[in-house]
UniProtKB/Swiss-Prot annotation:
GO molecular function annotations of the record: ATP binding; lysine-tRNA ligase activity; magnesium ion binding; tRNA binding
Cofactor: how and how many bound: Binds 3 Mg(2+) ions per subunit.
Lineage: Bacteria, Pseudomonadati, Pseudomonadota, Gammaproteobacteria, Enterobacterales
Enzyme class (EC, first level): ligase
One Pfam entry name: tRNA-synt_2
Protein name stated in the entry: Lysine--tRNA ligase
A Gene Ontology biological process term: lysyl-tRNA aminoacylation
Organism: Yersinia enterocolitica serotype O:8 / biotype 1B (strain NCTC 13174 / 8081)
Gene name linked to the record: lysS
Length: 505
């Protein structure tokens, strides 16, 4: 028997003993009728107290004679005879409580407080003061147990097993990990910042169906579900695009939506099957207008959320205050694979040879545009570290984008890259109903040839275009990847509160 097995068994026995002891304490509280009170009202948060009073001296605090009311989770406790120090954690941070036997009602300190456990939720009232070491603290005159925790606080996380725990039991991660709490605060600030920016630009926030009869707006494999009342199969949406453009047809000329998309694909550090996107559509604009808007959005968000246009991500530094780089797809390929020339990329046989030399398995159904795109992804994408717009995507891989006036092989489209990963995708929208119908037909052919990610034919959307879509540009930005960048997170699971996980057997 390994040394680990007795140790694991001993730990399990200790945990069971602690759980039993905590349940017995809860039973005693139930007997007294005070198990889960709900009459304590908090008036102050720890971060607000530190911000307002943290720089004041103890003499100044005594003169102010400030009584505060706080509540939160007991994270640490140091019992020193007749007095104790407690660290209380709330949504704003942590603050220290000073608990003296003589300042509480008789019996509370020895008969109640000492029997409480780490992780319990407490309410406290008292005067602010500074300890001899200068720490802002609350001298408690009232201390109450608000919620009895039946399980102990988690240890600090480390190692693979604990990473799994962080994702599966995010509530434990948020209790124990300051960095995780900050990540999701930043995420909330990013979402709020995007909404403020969009509203200031005259956009209206809308909501479109999450379940669709025809999944559209992107090339991806959808999740399938069944609507019992209608007795039809439906799809969780892979993108809101086609519904948002229907709204532009209807006269809402600037719309945006922040919501989840679902794609039945692999899980990786950059991909989660359920993810958050912001999509916007702007009438009487083209893709160049959205390139400028994207720059302005990122510059505004970094400065308002992070307080600086400079973002540190691992060992990389991005300055969003500087103009972003711009390259065509072919320019990017030639830059990062110098032996390649544009003439070879425009020749099907030579392009296929380049792709195969890179280990790309070229499918028979692929045209030249798809081959070029695969070469780009293999040779250039990972090198696009600084904020970069890639333009001139082939029409073959851009079934919803408007063809370029001078070169119908390409579209007026861009993708936005930071740190070697795609963050956004935008283009001048295809508003030619007949061209759109043909491209849908081409997608159906690709699907019949075995391309699971090819689009469906959406006849109603073509009908909408026949009523007239104004010249329009659209943009989609991955919120999760944006938050990864802003929080220096290197896996998408760290920025999604409850990421998709394989069930524990």
């Amino acid at each position: 028997m390994s040394e680990q097995k007795p140790q694991v068994a001993e730990q399990a026995q200790e945990l069971n003993s602690e759980l039993q002891a905590r349940r017995e304490k809860l039973a005693a509280l139930r007997e007294k009728g005070i198990a889960f009170p709900n009459d304590f009202r908090r008036e102050h948060l720890s971060d607000q107290l530190h911000a307002e009073y943290g720089e004041k001296t103890n003499e100044e605090l005594e003169a102010l004679d400030i009584e505060v009311t706080v509540a939160g989770r007991m994270m640490t406790r140091r019992i020193m005879g007749k007095a104790s120090f407690v660290t209380l954690q709330d949504v704003g941070g942590r603050i220290q409580l000073y608990v003296s036997r003589d300042d509480l009602p008789e019996g509370v300190y020895n008969e109640e407080f000492k029997k409480w456990d780490l992780g319990d939720i407490l309410g406290a009232r008292g005067k602010l003061f500074k300890t001899k070491t200068g720490e802002l603290s609350i001298h408690c005159s009232e201390l109450r147990l608000l919620t009895k925790a039946l399980r102990p606080l988690p240890d600090k996380f480390h190692g693979l097993a604990d990473q799994e725990t962080r994702y599966r039991q995010r509530y434990l991660d948020l209790i124990a990990n300051d960095e995780s709490r900050n990540t999701f605060k930043v995420r909330s600030q990013v979402m709020s910042g995007i909404r403020r920016f969009m509203v200031e630009k005259g956009f209206m926030e809308v909501e479109t169906p999450m379940m669709q009869v025809i999944p559209g707006g992107a090339s991806a494999r959808p999740f399938v579900t069944h609507h019992n009342a209608l007795d039809i199969d439906m799809y969780l949406r892979i993108a809101p695009e086609l519904y948002l453009k229907r709204l532009v047809v209807g006269g809402f000329e600037r719309v945006f939506e922040i919501n989840r998309n679902f794609r039945n694909e692999g899980v990786s550090p950059r991909h989660n099957p359920e993810f958050t996107m912001m999509e916007l559509y702007m009438a009487y604009a083209d893709y160049k207008d959205l390139i400028a808007l994207t720059e302005e959005l990122f510059r505004t968000l970094t400065e308002t959320v992070l307080g600086s246009s400079v973002v540190q991500y691992g060992d990389q530094t991005f300055d969003f205050g500087k103009p972003f780089a711009k390259l065509t797809m072919k320019e990017a390929i030639c830059k990062y694979r110098p032996e390649t020339n544009v003439a070879d990329l425009d020749d099907m046989d030579k392009a296929v040879a380049i792709a195969e030399s890179l280990g790309i398995k070229v499918e028979k159904s692929w045209g030249l545009g798809r081959v070029q795109c695969e070469i780009f992804e293999e040779t250039a994408e990972s090198h696009l570290i600084q904020p970069t717009f890639i333009t001139e995507y082939p029409a073959e891989v851009s079934p919803l984008a408007r063809r370029n006036d001078d070169n119908p092989f390409i579209t007026d489209r861009f993708e936005f890259f930071i740190g070697g990963r795609e963050i956004g995708n935008g283009f001048s929208e295809l508003n030619d109903a007949e061209d759109q119908a043909q491209r849908f037909a081409d997608q159906v052919s690709a699907k019949e040839a075995g391309d699971d990610e090819a689009m469906f034919y959406d006849e109603d959307y073509v009908t909408a275009l026949e009523h007239g879509l104004p010249p329009t540009a659209g943009l989609g930005i991955g919120i999760d990847r944006m938050v990864m960048l802003f929080t220096n997170s290197h896996t998408i699971r760290d920025v999604i509160l409850f990421p998709a996980m394989r069930p524990v057997k």
